[in-house]
Amino acid sequence: MYVMKQSGWLEVICGSMFSGKSEELIRRVRRAQFAKQEVKVFKPAIDNRYSEEAVVSHNGTSVIAIPVSCASDIRKHITTHTDVVAIDEVQFFDEHVVDVVQQLADEGYRVIVAGLDQDFRGEPFGPVPTLMSIAESVTKLQAVCTVCGSPASRTQRLINGRPASYYDPVILIGASESYEPRCRHHHEVPDHPAKKKTSTETATRP
């Protein structure tokens, strides 16, 4: 991580599920706390898989967090003594989180966000792509494909052990029983319009 000469910037940590995003966010938070910086950690209220008031990684590490229902609530908890603002599972917030993050960085806060850059369909997830484009630093992590062991950049949703349809809801909170990390070649999305179109064109090609 390079050193900023000015205070106030945005760091994005992204990748598939089980790639270590929350673990990396927690590591940066603890490092800031060790340096005697005041850190405020936030998470969407919708994410209560492991704890309602903590960010918990899949390997069990955790840090106390403030659950918020919408991005605008974050500012209510920021004070002049705050140095670092960290937001986990940022993909669950609406696009307004981009404005909140921009304002905080412009005002001199170090902002760290972590989230999925792709949804289970393999498509850009919520505000994360925009946050990546405006960030000073982007760390894209990879997991390990559960099928072949290759680097995994996608998240496979499983319903009763079977790949979920493209038309399933995008937001469905789950943990290891609902999702697996997959590589490009083993990521399955039944009923995907683009893939169905490609298959049809291939079948009709002379």
From Swiss-Prot:
Q: Which UniProt keywords apply?
A: ATP-binding, Cytoplasm, DNA synthesis, Kinase, Metal-binding, Nucleotide-binding, Transferase, Zinc
So where does ATP get bound? G15, S16, M17, F18, S19, G20, K21, S22, D88, E89, V90, Q91
Catalytic residues (positions): E89
Task: Quote the subunit structure annotation.
Answer: Homotetramer.
**This protein's record includes keyword Isomerase:** no
Q: Where is this region: Disordered?
A: 183-206
GO MF terms held by the record: ATP binding; thymidine kinase activity; zinc ion binding
Q: Where does Zn(2+) bind?
A: C145, C148, C183, H186
**Class in the EC hierarchy, top level:** transferase
**What protein is this chain from?**
Thymidine kinase
- Check the record and name the InterPro entries matching this protein: P-loop_NTPase (IPR027417), Thymidine_kinase (IPR001267), Thymidine_kinase_CS (IPR020633)
What catalytic activity does the UniProt entry give for this protein? thymidine + ATP = dTMP + ADP + H(+)
The organism of origin for this protein: Anoxybacillus flavithermus (strain DSM 21510 / WK1)
- What Gene3D superfamilies does the entry give? 3.30.60.20, P-loop containing nucleotide triphosphate hydrolases
